[in-house]
């Protein structure tokens, strides 16, 4: 954290912690009613953290309401956030994309009826998020695509929704020309091993390409889940020796890894924005990205700042990778133009400035409302 920021941790049961997710807590771990609620909701196969965290946050802020001018909720959207709003503390929320999209994709790609049922149970908290989002006066999102999806899925009035792009530190995510490129190296980031991220499609494409080019291999920033489709595919396609998962490394190492790659891939079925895409572009690595969700508006024109493929199409993805590996001049040009696009459009400084503008706009609108109502 910056020296000017302090962190208040809100203890929880941490029921999803590794290596024992969905554990049964000891009785001595239950300290209050929110711990009981967290365990009870999780026992019903529903993701409890948005509700439990928001209620704990409301309790903490009720004790310290005079310490803060505004509360910025980062897509928790639990009932506790609504309580904070109703207490009189100004609340602004960021919704990167509606989690209802994740729910649809996860249930669509579930392989059995039981898995579809459990996915629907897990994502049932999205109904709460819709109710809370509809009550908040000002919401930020990160792309035009997310804007449209939030309006459609959450039923939010467009005049309460505003776009502020997220960014990347282009002075940190930089090309490293002194680092040698490894022939055939592809790189991707899987922030979560879920259907929406499209890793399974990339693995199938990799297997296709390797029948012709045995040098092709994949580096994944992230961890596979032990029971995921991707984990099963790696074994079924005999890719164990041709894929490497790396996690828990600093940004400096990620930049170095990008510099060794011939291509970066974002195979997602949907993205509300995609930080991995602009991080790769900022490093000057030529990017292949699907047209899922907001990716086309983020990465720019096909063949200019990135290369596009349709989402969920293994053959198209394999063909694009195969073709791009044989186009050294195009890769260099796309990599250079991609970095220029990021520098021109996506900086954290700009994100911060625009976010602060919305803080003031929210405070001003509330002051006007209170003045009109005769309150202070």
Tell me what each language-model feature is.
Residues 145, 167:
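Carbohydrate-associated surface elements
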Residues 248-249, 256-261:
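Short alpha-helical donor nucleotide-sugar binding micro-motif in glycosyltransferases
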Residues 286-289:
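Short hydrophobic beta-strand element within catalytic cores of glycosyltransferases
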Residues 177-206, 219:
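Conserved donor-binding/catalytic core segment of Leloir-type glycosyltransferases
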């Amino acid at each position: 954290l910056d020296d000017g920021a302090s962190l208040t941790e809100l203890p929880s049961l941490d029921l999803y912690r590794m290596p024992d997710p969905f554990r049964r807590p000891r009785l001595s771990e239950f300290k209050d009613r929110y711990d009981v609620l967290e365990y009870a909701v999780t026992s019903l196969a529903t993701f409890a953290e948005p509700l439990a965290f928001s209620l704990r946050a409301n309790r903490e802020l009720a004790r310290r309401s005079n310490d803060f001018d505004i509360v910025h909720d980062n897509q928790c959207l639990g009932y506790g956030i609504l309580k904070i709003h109703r207490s009189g503390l100004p609340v602004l929320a960021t919704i990167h994309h509606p989690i209802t999209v994740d729910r649809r994709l996860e249930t669509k790609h579930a392989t059995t009826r039981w898995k579809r049922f459990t996915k629907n149970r897990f994502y049932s908290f999205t109904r709460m998020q819709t109710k809370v989002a509809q009550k908040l006066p000002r919401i930020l999102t990160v792309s035009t695509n997310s804007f449209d999806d939030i309006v459609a899925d959450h039923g939010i009035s467009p005049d309460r929704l505003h776009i502020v792009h997220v960014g990347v530190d282009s002075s940190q995510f930089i090309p490293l020309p002194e680092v040698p490129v490894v022939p055939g190296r592809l790189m991707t980031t899987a922030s979560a091993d879920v259907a929406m991220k499209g890793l399974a499609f990339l693995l199938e494409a990799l297997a296709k390409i390797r029948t012709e080019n045995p040098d092709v291999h994949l580096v994944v920033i992230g961890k596979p889940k032990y029971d995921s489709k991707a984990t099963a595919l790696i074994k079924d396609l005999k890719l164990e020796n041709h894929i490497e998962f790396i996690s828990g490394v600093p940004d400096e190492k990620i930049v170095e890894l990008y510099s060794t790659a011939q291509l970066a891939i974002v195979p997602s079925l949907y993205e509300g924005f995609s930080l991995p895409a602009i991080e790769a572009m900022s490093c000057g690595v030529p990017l292949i990205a699907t047209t899922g969700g907001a990716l086309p508006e983020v990465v720019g024109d096909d063949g200019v700042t990135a290369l596009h493929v349709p989402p969920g199409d293994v053959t198209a993805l394999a063909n694009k990778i195969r073709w791009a590996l044989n186009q050294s001049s195009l890769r260099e040009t796309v990599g250079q133009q991609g970095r220029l696009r990021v520098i021109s459009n996506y900086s954290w400084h700009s994100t911060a400035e625009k976010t602060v503008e919305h803080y003031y706009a929210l405070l001003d609108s509330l002051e006007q409302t209170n003045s009109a109502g005769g309150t202070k």
